[in-house]
């Protein structure tokens, strides 16, 4: 597969389109929720399931998706996944009830679960050590580009059409991606099909689903909530049982020796840290732009473009920097830069305006771009061609659950500090819960009681909470520096068959 010449880069273009389709869907739903609540008559619980149904199926489906790609062919699985994603997007767009929409979103999550691990599995199979970081940078950069483009395109569509149009945007992207994958992507799969590990499939899916649900619920209902604790404990028990099963079964779904790889472990952990810090930016900053600066959703998307600009610059030079300085140093510098940017963002006040936000988000994007290709290459480069699907799915699963933890924990920090600083004096008791619910709820209450002083309290409380979230995210960036320096091997661009796993192994090999 690696001997395809220029055709491989056309294949990367196909993978870029597929990853952008999933990326659009991540950011675009939140824009449509108010209109959907009114049109479908959805209550708050149903609105939460609009989001949760996708996330749970996505978490449960990734490892089975990796196995299917390894067994039946990654190109075949990706084509089927694109069809599922396109049809379920149509079903979402034309849903006539909350139940229908939740079901369609669950199927959409299945499509996403099939797409992402398959894309990641194809990169180490298609590219050698020299070119793989460039391909990873292209796919990762495109996926990140979808985050600001989602609100921009979604905001435009909602201003001119009905809410279903934000899901129809997936359809042409999927069609073009399908044609491109069909034309340019080579087929690849394991040389020998392993027997189905049904026990491993069931335990991994159950564990990831229960743990993810517990984390999501914990962010809303609290970490001492009985259902939260029960879900998280059940998930952890299932995952421990999964590991024990994999150790004893003759044909395990996941080769646990993968976790002896310093490259895979460090790359996966650093990817999880990245997902944590991204929440600090991508969840909080659109709220800041809309609630504090008064932009609409489309305007908040435009204000994320400095971050994307920095990201694209970082991705472009990341491979050269890693070659010149070594991956330990280049990744350490990238995490130090994004951490410093987050600390700078933590100095924001109500009167800061767009200039400060543009400066620190651009610096954050640059740091992110410097680390993403090398970190992903560390994990994906440790995979053999035969097990690339399952290995990529394990990497994606850990990063997804880690990102969910980041969203829940940082979201809890944001909410608790916002509520703790809010001055509710003079606010009617009946309106206090709505004011504490979110910055948007607080501003709505301030308008309803015609209180400019309470509006000021809402804004100040939110910005103070935002600063704390960004500072915590900054410390996570410093954690990334520590992991890179201590754990990341000096060389990550060598295949597992050719390179020792770590400095300790290198000494032994000598």
Regions found by a protein language model. Give the residues of each.
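Structural signature of transmembrane alpha-helices in multi-pass secondary transporters
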Residues: 22, 51-54, 58, 85, ...
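Residue-level signature of the transmembrane alpha-helical cores
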Residues: 18, 80-84, 88, 104, ...
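Transmembrane core module of solute transporters
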Residues: 9-58, 62, 142, 162, ...
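Helix-loop-helix hairpins in multi-pass membrane proteins, especially solute transporters
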Residues: 62-200, 226, 309, 351, ...
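C-terminal membrane-cytosol helix-exit motif in multi-pass small-molecule transporters
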Residues: 172-189, 207-216, 235-248, 480-488
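Interfacial helix-cap and linker-helix signal at transmembrane-aqueous boundaries
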Residues: 36-37, 68-69, 153-161, 215, ...
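Hydrophobic transmembrane architecture of multi-pass small-molecule transporters
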Residues: 176, 376-378, 382, 394, ...
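Flexible interhelical linker loops that connect adjacent transmembrane helices
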Residues: 2, 176-205, 247-262, 323, ...
């Amino acid at each position: 597969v690696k001997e395809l010449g220029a055709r491989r880069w056309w294949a990367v273009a196909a993978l870029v389109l597929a990853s952008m389709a999933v990326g659009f869907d991540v950011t675009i739903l939140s824009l449509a929720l108010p209109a959907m609540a009114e049109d479908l008559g959805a209550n708050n619980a149903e609105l939460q399931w609009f989001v949760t149904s996708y996330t749970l199926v996505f978490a449960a489906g990734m490892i089975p998706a990796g196995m299917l790609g390894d067994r039946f062919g990654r190109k075949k699985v990706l084509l089927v996944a694109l069809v599922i994603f396109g049809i379920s997007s149509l079903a979402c767009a034309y849903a006539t009830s909350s139940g229908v929409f939740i079901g369609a979103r669950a199927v959409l999550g299945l499509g996403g679960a099939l797409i992402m691990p398959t894309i990641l599995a194809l990169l180490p199979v298609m590219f050698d050590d020299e070119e793989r970081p460039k391909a990873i940078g292209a796919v990762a950069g495109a996926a990140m580009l979808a985050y600001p483009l989602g609100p921009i395109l979604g905001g435009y569509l909602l201003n001119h059409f009905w809410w279903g149009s934000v899901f129809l945007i997936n359809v042409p992207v999927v069609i073009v991606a399908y044609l491109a994958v069909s034309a340019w992507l080579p087929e690849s799969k394991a040389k020998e099909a392993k027997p189905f590990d049904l026990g491993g499939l069931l335990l991994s899916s159950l564990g990831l689903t229960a743990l993810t649900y517990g984390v999501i619920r914990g962010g809303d209902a609290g970490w001492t909530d009985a259902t939260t604790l029960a879900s998280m404990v059940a998930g952890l028990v299932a995952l421990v049982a999964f590991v024990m099963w994999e150790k004893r079964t003759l044909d395990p779904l996941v080769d646990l020796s993968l976790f002896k790889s310093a490259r895979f472990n460090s790359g996966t952990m650093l990817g999880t840290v990245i997902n944590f810090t991204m929440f600090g930016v991508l969840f909080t900053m659109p709220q800041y732009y809309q609630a504090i600066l008064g932009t609409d959703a489309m305007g908040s998307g435009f204000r994320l473009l400095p971050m994307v600009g920095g990201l694209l610059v970082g991705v472009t030079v990341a491979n050269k920097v890693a070659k010149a300085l070594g991956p330990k140093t280049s990744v350490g510098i990238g995490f130090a830069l994004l951490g410093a940017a987050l600390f700078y963002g933590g100095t924001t006040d109500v009167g800061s305006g767009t200039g400060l936000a543009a400066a620190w988000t651009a610096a954050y994007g640059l740091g992110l771009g410097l680390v993403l290709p090398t970190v992903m290459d560390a994990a994906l480069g440790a995979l053999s061609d035969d097990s690339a699907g399952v290995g990529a799915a394990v990497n994606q699963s850990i990063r997804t659950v880690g990102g969910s933890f980041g969203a829940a924990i940082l979201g809890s920090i944001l909410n608790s500090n916002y509520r703790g600083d809010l001055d509710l004096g003079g606010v009617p008791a009946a309106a206090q819960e709505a004011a504490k619910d979110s910055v948007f709820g607080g501003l709505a209450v301030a308008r309803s009681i015609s209180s400019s002083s309470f509006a000021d309290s809402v804004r100040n409380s939110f910005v103070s909470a935002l600063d704390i979230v960004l500072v915590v995210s900054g410390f996570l960036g410093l954690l990334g520096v520590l992991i890179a320096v201590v754990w990341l091997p000096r060389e990550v661009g060598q295949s597992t068959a050719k390179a020792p796993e770590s400095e300790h192994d290198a000494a032994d090999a000598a």
